[in-house]
Amino acid sequence: MSKVKIFWQETCPNCPQAKELGKKLAASGVAVEYHNIRDSAGLTEAVMHGVMTTPSVVIVADDDSEKAVWRGSTPKFDEVKATLASAPA
């Protein structure tokens, strides 16, 4: 099953919107991970996905391959749900 990874940092003015999207997705049953790029684990994960800016939202399959990416922006809830529905697990 696909999951959503949200990359954020404290100084990012648009990251609260991305984190709110994550809360809505989680409430609808989507697996969501949050990665603060200012800590070592979050930075490592960001490097693996080529994240250079925040917020970034990445949909990944079980094997961690990317299915969709929004870098430097927060997609709409419906857009993410539609992408998840059409993305193979």
For the regions a protein language model found, what residue spans apply to each?
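Structural micro-motif
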Residues: 49-59
